[in-house]
């Protein structure tokens, strides 16, 4: 789309992290990292945008859909720090993830990290390049991720089929 072309140009002209969208979710209580990882894998399967990279063909950016590839959830444990330092350090780790430059051609343009403060407190960071997602879409992805996690935790069947409406369907409107 024209908007994505502008973001591609601006990404190349700047430091590269200005258009990273980050969302940080505090999780309290029992958290199963393996279920988060399974939920992320289903999101990547269902949403083509999360498997898309941007290549250059004859000087023009083009989207490339990559095949699904399972990945491991990145985890950081800061539980050894003094309790009063953990929340601030967790936010610093999440912001650092948000500020890392995405390589548009190599991808992926979507990354997550689970930061463990103690056995019942976590900060979950989701970062995606704005070329693939807007704020509204980020909220939808978060809701779907939480729903998938609940379904896995409750032993319910999970829909792994591609989402009926993809991000490019909205961009085309």
What are these regions (language model features)?
Residues 2-76, 81-173:
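Acyl-group handoff/entry surfaces in thioester-processing enzymes
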